[in-house]
């Protein structure tokens, strides 16, 4: 035994040595590439191909999540769920979707880099670490984010100086992105994220704020905000139209797209189903004692390119460039609700065959000879679904307008329709006055007037009623001209909190009135849950009954203990029994999603002073009961969500909001006015005579000119009684368009060219000279000069050419999803799918239709025909064979009968049998008998 120990020890040592070397080799093979790769990524020595691989993998992850969402929505049978309807109503137009997708690909790429570089090292991601500039550029370019992070190219033409760009870009020549569509919302205070960069407050329910957890937003709704419909107090001063105008104008200046995907990237969690916080899913948790699901679906707003997790690697590390949200619209009061905020949407909205510069109208439905909004072209959202069982309304498409939310409620669609009619009325009249104008000039001049009327009605008639005269004077004040240092970009707190004060003024009923402004006998009042989406506008009386109801019905008064009616908190977007949504909880959750600082921070911002105790809150809201409920939920004034805090304040004198929202709304309206180079009062935008005519106009006059109402209130926002408060339309001042008459100067040397195919020509004058400005429609590129000065010698001007852009050749930003193939069309492109896949609602992604390919169906049909044919042929052959067999048997029988012995005699000598069958021989063979011989022979198988 003693002799075996050394031997065993030696053997064990050799084994351990071999094992150690093996482990070292394995570790070297496994870890060395990682450390080298990490070093390369961190210190800029990685090849571009590896970075592109990360981006491409991230693209597949994001597109997979998007495709899952599209497939889920397309496969939905029956009525959509409330959360699907909400996502449909927030579906951005294609340009915004492309920007949102690019931002999510970039975010996923940076996440992947973080995981690869730091995750395998077993340590957290330090915000102070940055990626090399070359790597950042590669990610930004490959993801598609780079073009949306750079200043746009501003055209230097007479036309660009005369009319605003459809995107809002280049309004400020020194800051061309200010107020432009698809740029980040402005921050007036640094955001408040739980991790300092991206995660919302409340993402981790165990995190405490001032020693207290944040209350679930649904609990805030239940205990503070919700009020039964029957308990609503009506406004004795202002009409429902004031509320609807506020919603309409909100949709003119702000739209924040949700995440392009409704599923967690890489994790596969569906935001419609999961109750976990897995970006972009941020579900609204329900109380444990609530029946039904444990949460309400909620998707985060898409991040702007280069912000949040992606932004931590960019520029200013002291602020870490936290997550920002995108505004898909122009910030300006420019009637983008009518004309859109992108060239692609503007192209869809215009009637390109008219010489008057008209907008498209509905060709299937008319309202007593007046136009309706056109329908969206397929593929269109499935959201605009009628009530089940309603005859003649199945499959009504959504309306197409400058904003995708035009179809949400009939009252909102009514205002969109009103302004569509007003544009076409103005464009036709202006073209009649100026026969030499091109269609584009008539369109642009009418658009300019409609935009000015939006500005006048909002700043002159709407905002002072909301803020009250004193707060309006304090925060907005008189117009003193264009201020190029004023940033007009809509702020996050305005769009996400302050301007949502209008939700507290929504009446639970939509009322439709007859010509005497009485309840319409055939059109009873509708609860909001029965009034979503557009078909009632088409099938139930058109605009006039709705507008009568808006003019003569009071709005809901925003009473402190009646903040929001239960039509919005309990039955939002309900079309069936598939659940509900809660608008109040959505507003609170959206504020946290956007990183809005709390109520106290904004009070300090507006000079109102911070609150520290329950008693101070009670004093600020002047309501002990309400203050007690809020403090019981939040624990400390610092924790109160800004939207709730602003709503809880008592109304200012002759106002419909408290001091905080008056400050925030007033500040934003002043920025929208003073920071807009094309504001209607700005020098050079209109002539003095034109400004005087515009100042005479009103919303009441617009209603007179575009509906069948013979009389209206002088102030459309003042709740009015019929007939004493109504004026005949002939007494309501309107525009005298003669001041827009433009006579060509005598001896004008400009020879107008023939119409420019797929483009427009505008005669423009500036600095004492006249020029021709050429532009191409969306999808075409100008080849030749943009602008040509008129020659003193006269003569025809040779126009440039508009060439089609082949979007399908853009490999860096393919217009179609990888699941689809791109086909170039004149002025655009078309995404096509291989059967049985079909295009999803985004128009670019192919999803499974749930059926067999058409070719397979044809093959199956042909196969069935072939099988049936073969079966028939086989049956025919069998029948013929059987028939032939029977005939053969009969022939044998007949033959046997003729060769049989006479009756009474058997075969052979015994005569005992009358059988026709010959006697069997040995082994069962028949024995033939030769009648001529006494001898016999054996026959094989057949008679002789």
Swiss-Prot record:
The chain crosses the membrane at residues 859-879. It holds the Pfam family EGF_CA. Residues 748-804 form the Sushi domain. Ca(2+) binds at residues 252, 330, 332, 334, 336. One of its GO terms (biological process) is hormone biosynthetic process. Residues 1-30 form the signal peptide. GO terms for cellular component: extracellular space; membrane. It is a single-pass type I membrane protein. The record marks 405 as: Transition state stabilizer. Heme b binds at residues 250, 408, 503. Residues 931-944 have a biased composition (Polar residues). It is linked to Defects in TPO are the cause of congenital hypothyroidism with goiter, a simple autosomal recessive trait observed in Toy Fox Terriers (TFTs). Neonatal affected pups exhibited inactivity, abnormal hair coat, stenotic ear canals, and delayed eye opening. Palpable ventrolateral cervical swellings were evident by 1 week of age. Serum thyroid hormone and thyroid-stimulating hormone concentrations were low and high, respectively. Belongs to the peroxidase family. XPO subfamily. This is Thyroid peroxidase. It comes from Canis lupus familiaris (Dog). The lineage of its organism: Eukaryota, Metazoa, Chordata, Craniata, Vertebrata.
